Amino acid sequence: QTCCGYRMCVPC
């Protein structure tokens, strides 16, 4: 998983 956006930890 990768943290991207605003505190959004999702498979980017």
From Swiss-Prot:
Main subcellular location: secreted
Residues carrying Pyrrolidone carboxylic acid: Q1
Disulfide bond as UniProt keyword: yes
Keywords: Amidation, Disulfide bond, Hydroxylation, Neurotoxin, Oxidation, Pyrrolidone carboxylic acid, Secreted, Toxin
Tissue expression notes: Expressed by the venom duct.
PTM statement from Swiss-Prot or TrEMBL: Contains 2 disulfide bonds.
Cysteines joined through disulfide linkages: C3-C12, C4-C9
GO cellular component, as recorded: extracellular region
GO terms, molecular function: toxin activity
Record PTM Cysteine amide, positions in chain: C12
Subcellular location: Secreted
Modification type Methionine sulfoxide: residues: M8
4-hydroxyproline sites (modified residues): P11
Domain notes: The cysteine framework is X (CC-CX[hydroxyPro]C).
Role: Chi-conotoxins inhibit the neuronal noradrenaline transporter (NET/SLC6A2).
Family statement drawn from the similarity comment of this UniProt entry: Belongs to the conotoxin T superfamily.
Stated name of the protein: Chi-conotoxin-like 2
